[in-house]
Structures are given as structure tokens and as C-alpha cells.
């Protein structure tokens, strides 16, 4: 019996030792892989390609190996066979750069003028505009003209300037005689609306000879919107000229609202505008007459225009103006003008209740405020405060223990390693793809996993992607607490306020950059 116990103990001890050794080996293996990964990247940066080729095969099990493989392919993309790119994309369907590689290689095959090879590599329309233009040009080059012209038309109808690769496609479409001149007018309208004067001028200059009169008028209007009345009087009234005049009129209104206001009757007569079209012009000017510097006449005209308007956003702007000036009578008037659907917004329900309280209709007001309190948001909280009741925050709890199946895939392994190397933006791209592919329950678990790992920005990102608005802990993590405590200590600004501003502006992404260069 004692001998049996001794044998059992030795077996258990051996098992524990094996588990320990195995665990250490795995840890050492990851450390070794990271070290080798850093060496390969440094060798690559120093163009020591013999070192790269020698070391890469030993890293095939490392989570970030696909990124090295991607770099290997794209560094020499002009010499890669299609099968290499196809195999890489198929082997890494969830890798963010692999998703863009297909379009890049379509463009490379177009550079080689391998049109049949392009269509064999990409039987379906690729993702980027440049690649799509090359794809449809390949269709034309291989005798599939009807598909090419359909694609050309879709790519043509935009107010943006398209990539140079599209010029070839548009050129053969035009030469085929299949491009309707009206397509020019439609794209000119879109470009004019987008403020793309350069494109308007180019397109007008390319129009057929029998369209030169309207082309010249369009160019003059695009270069000087203040000539809109001349344009309206000298061109025949059509849907196109009315739309062009409306776009130019909006530009005039931005610069001189009073000039635009006085111009409306003449413009309406010259272009034979109906009441809806005239109201569209009134709305444009009314938006510009919301300041404190308007005259009594302008204010009266503005309110008359808004009273006739069907624009919900314009009426809401007028409601806010009444609130800003403390105009209670105006508040009542303009709230009443809102369509029923808009009146159901939290903001306007609150102010309707506010007006009812002012008139002594307390029961009706409290009914609205109690209903409002059941929602999540600023006005529901204010509603509770208004009637002196406690607002109950609804907080959903994500599972503390995350399903291991969610954390053991190649995507999560890449996220972990990217975060280790402080490649936050690349990690965010991986994370976004991963979260997007999961159910709401799984998204909540991923948010919790990020929270537990102190990946604060990824926790926030998961709650946004999954619309997990009531997962407040993961949505508003108390990130960088010690840092904020240190830098707000002794200052007038409260720590909570500093953290709230940082969360609002960056969503806790330390690498985020604003359009004007602010970061973190």
C-alpha cells in the first residue's frame, strides 16, 4: 500500500514538473519569437535581406508572421505571380492589410496590361475606386463592353475627382458613343454641389460641340457664383439649370444673405420656379439669418419663411434660437411647428413638459417627465432632477469570465502582440474587424476582455461597435487614473472633469490625432 502511494506521488510530481517545464518552454518560445521578430524588422530596415530570408522560416508560428509575409510580398509586388498573392489572401482572410492587397494587385496587373490575368485574379469587382476602374477597363479590353459601360457609368456619377486610372475607362466609353451627354450634366451638377470648381471646368470643357453655349455658362457660374442671376436669365429653364442656380445661390447666401434674399423673386421668375423650389431658396437664406445682427425686417422675413418650411432641422434651429434668447412665446410657437416624429425626441419632450409646468398643467408635465426618465441620456437625467426624483442608471454587466474561444484565435493573438509592440493603430484595425464579426453577447465579452487587459480604447471601441450603451464600466473605463491624479493634483480642474474631456475627445486612444495636430 505504501509502495503504491509512493508511486502515485512520484507520478503526480512528475506531472507537475512536466506542466511547469511546458509552461516555461511556451513562455521562452514567445520571448524568443519576439526577439527574432525585432531582429528581422531591424535587418529589413537595414536592407539585410539575406538575414531576413534566413530568419523568417523560424517565425511561422508567431502571430505577427503574416505581417512579415505581407511586407515580403508588397516590397516586390511588381514581380509577384498572381498565385502568390491569391494564396496569401486566402490564408489570411481576416488580416486587415490582406483585405487591401487584392485591390493593390489588381492595379499592379493593370500596370502590366495583363487584362485577362486581372479578371482571372479578381472575378468580382474589387474594393477601391482605382481598382474598379482598372477592372472595368479590363472588361472592355476582353470584349465585355456592356459590363464595362455599366461600371463606367456608376464610377462617373460623382462630384469627386476620380483617380487617373479612370481616365482610360472614361475615354473609351466616350469614344464608343455610349456615353449620354446628359451624364456630363449630371456629373457637373454633382461636382458643383461638392464645390469642386476645377472638375466642373474640366467636364464642361469636354462636352460635345453642340453643348458649348451651356458649357460656357456653366464655367462662368462655377468661377463666379455671384453671376447666378445672369446665368438664370440667359439659359433656358430646365431641371438642370434650376439645380445649378440653386447650388450657386447657396454660395451667394453664405457670403451675403441679404443680397441672396432680395434676389429670390428675380431668380424665381427667370427660372420659372414652383413654390417648393422657391421655398428651398428661402430655407437657404433663413439658415443665414439666425444671428443677433439681423434687422427687424430680416427677422420677420426669416420667421415667415420658416413658418412655411418643411425642413425639420431648420425649425429645430429656430426652436433653439428661442431657447437661447429666453423667448418663451417663440418656444411654444416653434415647438408646435415641429412634425410629430421630431416632437418625440427627448429634447423636445422635455421642453414641452417645461412649458406645461409654466402653465400650471403639472399632471400632464409630470407624466411626460416620468416617461422620459425611463430612457438613457441627458434630458432623461434633467427630467428626474426637475421633479426631484432619483434617476436610476441602467448598467449592464458583461461576463467576468470571457469565453476562451473568443481569445484563442489568430486575430486575438495578433491584437495581443500588436499591443505588446505599442502598434496601437494596427491593433485597433485588427480589433475592429474582430468585434464586427461577433454577436452582441460576444462583443460584450470582448469589451470586458479589453477592459481586463487595460486596453482602454479597445474596450470603448467594442462598446461603440456593438452599441452596448448600457455597459458603462467598459464604455467609460477609469483609464490612466494615477496619471490624471498626478497632473490634476493642486489644480483647479477636478480629476473627473479632466478624464471626461479626455474620454470625449480621444475615446481613450493615446495615438489619436485631431485634424489640427492635437494627439492623445
Regions from the PLM with identified roles:
Residues 2-13:
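Bacterial N-terminal signal peptides that target proteins for export
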Residues 20-25:
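N-terminal signal peptide c-region/cleavage motif recognized by signal peptidases
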Residues 28-36, 47-48, 60-67, 79-80, ...:
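Generic helix N-cap/helix-start motif at coil->alpha-helix transitions
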Residues 42, 71, 75, 108, ...:
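Residue-level signature for tetratricopeptide repeat
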Residues 51-55, 80-92, 114-124, 146-158, ...:
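Alpha-helical repeat scaffolds
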Residues 70, 300-302, 307, 359-370, ...:
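Catalytic glycan-binding domains that act on GlcNAc-containing polysaccharides
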Residues 72-74, 86-90, 102-107, 282-293, ...:
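Alpha-helical adaptor scaffolds
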